[in-house]
Amino acid sequence: AGWVGGVTAGDWGGPLGVGVCGVGADDDAVTEAWLAGLGRESFVSIEPFFAAGSRGYAVTPQPVHIELYPRVTTQPPILPADAGPLRTAFWSLAVRWYAWRASSVPGRAPPNIRLFVRYHAPGRAAVLPHSRGLAKGLVGVVHAYAGRGHEGTNAVVIAHELLHTLGATDKYDPVDLMPQWPDG
């Protein structure tokens, strides 16, 4: 089942359904207005990115299909910055449980991958919390800014976490801890 396992290239007989659920990270009016008007067009750059990246591999020409799912009003579990391995394992289980419950829509098939995008009002925080994508459970929690001017940056973060749900890992230079080019 998707809530336990992951995706392999053999699973790609067709596009993987990616359900994006908007979540308000704050009570700001800007965030609320953004969520009220959120549409699939906010994510249109992600599908071509994956299509271009899949050329030359034995997967479908359109590897992902982004679908907007209803807004979620309950917050996903938050992983504390100082969480150790045990706390992280419990958080992972809690996120999978949350994803299963929060993205269930009567009469609609569940997506293969669930991404919960927590929108924050611009200007409230200089740095957003870390976003995370889990291969086990095919779920991600993404932190993004509300507003059209942030759609490009948000798409990069969403695509990055989506890659993590598919098993990609970050690669960092051990000396300067910067991402390794082009693999990181």
Summary of predicted features, one role per range:
Residues G2-R108, Y119:
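Propeptide-to-catalytic entry region of secreted or membrane-anchored zinc metalloproteases
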Residues G2-V4, H130, G167:
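Short intrinsically disordered, low-complexity coil segments enriched in acidic
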Residues L16-G19, A109-R114, K136-G140:
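Loop/turn elements at helix/coil->beta-strand transitions in domains of secreted/extracellular proteins
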Residues V30-S42, L134, A146-A155:
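Extracytoplasmic/periplasmic, Sec-exported soluble proteins
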Residues R40-F43, E47, V139, V156-H160:
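Extracytoplasmic/secreted envelope proteins and their assembly/folding machinery
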Residues P61-Q62, V127-S131, P174-M178:
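Short acidic alpha-helical/loop segments enriched in Asp/Glu that coordinate divalent cations
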Residues R118-G152:
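Active-site scaffold of zinc-dependent metalloenzymes
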Residues V141-G184:
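The catalytic-center signature of Zn2+-dependent metalloproteases
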